[in-house]
């Protein structure tokens, strides 16, 4: 009995008329014929099992002559289970022999006259003729660009330009340029307002410090409030126009503004001197007169050409000149230092001290500034008896 059973099952892989209607032994996972035993229970990885590749495709008459299972039945809702004969598509060839597999080539694009007929209304000659107009040229070419073909002037350029603008419309405005053009003045206005508020607070702070010098140890108060005019108590820095101290407050503010203006001018002068825009002739050794301009014979020639005088010359009686080039930077500062050193000889003793201070690192300077700011008021009261000894110490240190 085992032989016919095994023979029938061995042929079920190719015989479409012998299906597995009851669903027993699906894919022969538990069939003892395919060595199902306790030593190899995992049939998912069994190499001897039969996957029945053709058993699921049930042909006509699989359930006997004239028998068609109703609405699906045991084999599901496939057309074969309903008894309908369908033609299965042929299996594709393997990938190694399939020369048509993979991405198909991109089809050829249709011609431009079919996809964009509006672009074919002008030929190349008319297009280059229309580019002669700077307004049209800006639409198609960047700044400084030019067309590769020769552009011939055409008398009907106005009509061509009008036709182009009637078809394409006016060019769109560049919003980036508009934004940058508006952002610049707004930033300048904001900076001016900020500086104006700070500048107005600086005189008030200096005025408060100035008036506090007259009220050491007592709260400041305006002396004009005790006059014949009844005025409420107020500070000397906020006198009303009816107060007698108002004119003194205005005078203090005016002096403070002049002081701030002087500081700004000094800063501008230092900046111009650093950039070499103040061509001041240095003092020549052994001479008190200098002159600028061409010389007959210069012992020292100035290098390069500039819009400023390049050398300073002394003109002796023999006609020859002694020339010294003007420094390219700090010319005015060097002139002031030479002038002061010639009249005050003790300033030369400060050169070594200045060179030593310049050699210090910025960290040391920041530390010194912080110490003076934090301990300065207390140190002044402690070191006040020793202040007369400071010039003596500086003189001894410079003479060593």
From Swiss-Prot:
Cell compartment(s), UniProt: Virion membrane
Post-translational modification: Isoform M is N-terminally acetylated by host at a ratio of 90%, and N-glycosylated by host at the pre-S2 region.
Protein name (Swiss-Prot/TrEMBL): Large envelope protein
Residues carrying lipid (N-myristoyl glycine): 2
Biased composition (Polar residues): 79-88
Spans through the membrane: 182-202, 254-274, 349-369, 376-398
Glycosylated sites: 320
Biotechnological and industrial applications of this entry: Systematic vaccination of individuals at risk of exposure to the virus has been the main method of controlling the morbidity and mortality associated with hepatitis B. The first hepatitis B vaccine was manufactured by the purification and inactivation of HBsAg obtained from the plasma of chronic hepatitis B virus carriers. The vaccine is now produced by recombinant DNA techniques and expression of the S isoform in yeast cells. The pre-S region do not seem to induce strong enough antigenic response.
Pre-S1: annotated segments: 2-119
Homology family: Belongs to the orthohepadnavirus major surface antigen family.
Pfam entry (one): vMSA
Keyword Membrane among record annotations: yes
GO biological process: caveolin-mediated endocytosis of virus by host cell; fusion of virus membrane with host endosome membrane; virion attachment to host cell
Spans annotated as Disordered: 70-115
Comment field on protein domains: The large envelope protein is synthesized with the pre-S region at the cytosolic side of the endoplasmic reticulum and, hence will be within the virion after budding. Therefore the pre-S region is not N-glycosylated. Later a post-translational translocation of N-terminal pre-S and TM1 domains occur in about 50% of proteins at the virion surface. These molecules change their topology by an unknown mechanism, resulting in exposure of pre-S region at virion surface.
Virion surface topological domain: 2-181, 275-348, 399-400
Region (Pre-S2): 120-174
Source species, domain of life: Viruses
Intravirion side: 2-253, 203-253, 370-375
């Amino acid at each position: 009995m085992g032989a016919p059973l095994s023979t029938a099952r061995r042929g079920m892989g190719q015989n479409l008329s012998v299906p597995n209607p009851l669903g027993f032994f699906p894919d022969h996972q538990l069939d003892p014929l395919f060595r199902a035993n306790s030593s190899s229970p995992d049939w998912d990885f069994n190499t001897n099992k039969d996957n029945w590749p053709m058993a699921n495709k049930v042909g006509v008459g699989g359930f006997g002559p004239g028998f068609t299972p109703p609405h699906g039945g045991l084999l599901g809702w496939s057309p074969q289970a309903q008894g309908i004969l369908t033609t299965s598509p042929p299996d594709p060839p393997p990938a190694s022999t399939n020369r048509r597999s993979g991405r198909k080539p991109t089809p050829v694009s249709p011609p431009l006259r079919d996809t964009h007929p509006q672009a074919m209304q002008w030929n190349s000659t008319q297009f280059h003729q229309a580019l002669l107009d700077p307004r049209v040229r800006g639409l198609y070419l960047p700044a400084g660009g030019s067309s590769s073909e020769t552009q011939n002037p055409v008398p009907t350029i106005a009509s061509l330009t009008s036709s182009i603008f009637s078809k394409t419309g006016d060019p769109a405005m560049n919003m980036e340029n508009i934004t940058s053009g508006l952002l610049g003045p707004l930033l300048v206005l904001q900076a001016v307002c900020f500086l104006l508020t700070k500048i107005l607070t600086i005189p008030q702070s200096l005025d408060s410090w100035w008036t506090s010098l007259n009220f050491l140890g007592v709260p400041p108060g305006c002396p004009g409030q005790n006059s014949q005019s009844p005025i409420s108590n107020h500070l000397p820095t906020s006198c009303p126009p009816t107060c007698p101290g108002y004119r003194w407050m205005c005078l203090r503010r005016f002096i403070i503004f002049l002081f701030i203006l002087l500081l700004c001018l000094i800063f501008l002068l230092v900046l111009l001197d650093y950039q070499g825009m103040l061509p001041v002739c240095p003092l020549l050794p052994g001479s008190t007169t200098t002159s600028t301009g061409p010389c007959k014979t210069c012992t020292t020639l100035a290098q390069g050409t500039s819009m400023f005088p390049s050398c300073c010359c002394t003109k002796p009686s023999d006609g020859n000149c002694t020339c010294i080039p003007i420094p390219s930077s700090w010319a005015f500062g060097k002139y002031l230092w030479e002038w002061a050193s010639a009249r005050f000889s003790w300033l030369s003793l400060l050169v070594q001290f200045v060179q030593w201070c310049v050699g210090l690192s910025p960290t040391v300077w920041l530390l010194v500034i912080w110490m003076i700011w934090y301990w300065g008021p207390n140190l002044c009261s402690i070191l006040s008896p020793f202040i007369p000894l400071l010039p003596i110490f500086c003189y001894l240190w410079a003479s060593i």
